[in-house]
Amino acid sequence: MQEGKLSLESKDIAAEKRQELLRLFPETQTEGGRIDFDQLKRVLGESVDTGRERYGMNWPGKADCFRLIQSPSTATLLPVREESVRFDESENLIIEGDNLEVLKLLQKGYQNKVKMIYIDPPYNTGNDFIYPDDFVDNLKNYLQYTGQVDAEGKRFSTNLDSDGRFHSKWLNMLYPRLYLARNLLCEDGVIFISCDENELKNLIQLMDAVFGESTALGTLTVLCNPKGRSQDKYFATNHEYIVVYGRSILPKGALAIEKKDDQVEAEYGEEDEGGKYRLLELRNTHREFGQHNRPNLWYPIYVDEVGAVSTEMTHGAIEVHPLWDDGFRGCWTWGLEKAENESELLVAKEVKGKWKIFRKSYASGAERMLKSILSESDFYTESGQRDFAALFGSKEKIFQSPKATGLLKTLMETSLKDGDLVLDFFAGSGTTGHAALRLSEEERIDASFILVQLPEPTGRDDYKSISDITKERVRRVIQTHEKQSEGKLDLQQKGQSRRKGGFRVFRLAPSNFKVWDAHTDEGLEGVERQMELAVNHIMPDRTSEDLFYEILMKSEYPLTAKVENFDASGITAFSVEDDALIVCVERKVTAEAVTAIAKRSPSKVIFLDEAFGGNDQLKANAKMNFESAGVKRFETV
């Protein structure tokens, strides 16, 4: 059995990258466990670019971005049940806090688990708020911003275009967040980023640097304001962009979506026992392909006197080749083997005195690719404002220019399936959560969401921060659906929809456990304060549930992992994922409680350090008990 201390820091990104390199190139490891880059160059040979001048994107502050990425977070996420809806059932999360810190905290439990990311970051129009990160102590920086600690002269302001580092500030804000977000995407995951012309060029270069140019999937143009902005300088801008990248290179058609009912009705006019279908010509209608370069797709198909189709010659049948009207020798779209195996789908029709071969294309599962210009009225900003106003029952602009729900639903249809997870770490008014809930209610896609929003002040009395608006909007979406469902099928009977019909609120905060501050003054008072941690290392006013969720998250489990409370001989313990992990956050533990936990044979157990009260014998007996029960790892915190 392994024994150790639970790390209270977020994942060490740099260390993970080093381990990945050493796994691929073990011959580059030095005696001290470092990487010999000269050896790495020799291993890679001609693949290494040793020139001084290289094409790439650089800007003032880029080096600090890497320091931000590599500096671990010791923060935690506190559960806020009173602001949640069906906390224990829902798999949706709304997290209030600085998204950089939150993204770091999500690295352990959500790496490679997010299928889709959508963000609508500040457009950098000259009046946008750009959150000033601090690579030395970003959590303290966040607490100062939210007024949780004092800081004389701390200045948070908009990113004015008169500032000489106007573009650099925007890049410095976005780069580390995108870098961390990429780690959360699964291999076939997709990220969509809204922007306008102010930073489009920089955003594409930034995405090439973080995700790789080969994973670019395209740039969508969204008609968001048909009238155009009359205050613009030269042209009345009426569009925005969505830049789309994959976590890896995706196959053709990976983002196709199901055709709408009206489109099916219009396009699929034939019907048989297999359902609605349309006829598509089997001959390749692109003239650049033909017998000259696709000889395997040139073969005869036979049509008998009653129009029956076969790939084999029958008495009296006519031989049909994929010829163009001018005699050009084209080719079929199917190979001979496929035509033989699926000959029941082939249909012959006489056109202008000549036989042509068609194939049946059924409407069931029919897909279409999104056009690169999204011009439907459901995507307009005005539509987003109507959706928002309908929920809040007011025409007052509580939130400026919320994204259209229809736009987000369409993007989700390209990427999500039942059980998938979508992340939005610039959540704003909560359109992403709204769209995900709507798709679930319509029984089209049952996906979960994580929304992250900074508690940016609004200056209002009712909704004091943007994150308050985020939570209230999603709350109202759920309430609206429940009212509409009254008298219909009980949501409890719909299983997953009930489970998705809620959200858990978490709030960014300093760790529940007082940790050594590496940035403290080295004076006597500073050292004395740090020494106090050895006496009482748990923050005051923190609950058992607060402690549990920090341990859960830092043990590499998602915040929505299956959890069961149970009684262990008079004390409460938490079982995670059917005893894969058992956590006990009681301040005092007994031998009987240890025995009760050991009987469940968990894979891993975690206790508080102080639970053993300095009783080395009790702790030693606990270790022996757990080892006998087959526990693989025993940790304390």
Mark where each language-model region is.
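Phosphate/ATP-binding catalytic cores across multiple sugar-kinase/actin-like superfamilies
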Residues: 99-102, 109, 173-178, 184-187, ...
